[in-house]
C-alpha cells in the first residue's frame, strides 16, 4: 500500500496545515504571508520597524487590557508561557549541522575526488539560483515558497497518478539529454588532465 502525502509528512499539525485539513490555519498562514509580503515588497515597509512597532502595539494593548481588568473587576488576559525549549534548539542545531555537513561533503567530493559530474550538477543548481535571483528578491522567493508549499502537496494528493506519469516522462528526457552532455563535454574534461599527465611522463 502506497503512503499518502499526508502520511509521509511526519509532523501531524504541519501535514494538516499544508494539506488543507486545517482550513482555518491554512487560510491564516496564506493571508498573513500575503499581507507581510505586500507590506514589505509593495508598500516599502522595513522589517525592523515593523517588528518593533508590532511589539510596541502588543505591549500597549496588553497593558491597557490588564489595567481595565483591574478597574472593571474582569479576569486578567491569559498569556501563554512563551519560551524556546532546549529540545527545539537542539533539533534546529542538528538540522543545520546535517545540512552543513552535506554541503561540505559535496565540496570535498568535487575538490578531492575531482568529480566532474558532481561539479556540473552543482554549477547548474547555483546558476539557476543566481538566474532566478536576478528577477526575484529573497522576500518574494520566501513568499513563493510558502505559497507553493500550500499548493503542491494538495494538488499532488489529488492528481498523483497523472503527475507521476508526467514526472517520469520528464525524468527520462532529462536523463537522455544529460547522457548526451556527459558524452560530449564532461568526458572530454575528464580526459584532458589524463592526457597532460601522459605527455609529461
UniProtKB/Swiss-Prot annotation:
It is a multi-pass membrane protein. Residues 14-201 form the Reticulon domain. InterPro entries: Reticulon (IPR003388), Reticulon-like (IPR045064). One of its GO terms (cellular component) is endoplasmic reticulum membrane. It is found in: Endoplasmic reticulum membrane. It comes from the Eukaryota. It holds the Pfam family Reticulon. The chain crosses the membrane at residues 25-45, 46-66, 135-155. Keywords: Endoplasmic reticulum, Membrane, Transmembrane, Transmembrane helix. GO terms for biological process: response to bacterium. This is Reticulon-like protein B10. The gene is RTNLB10.
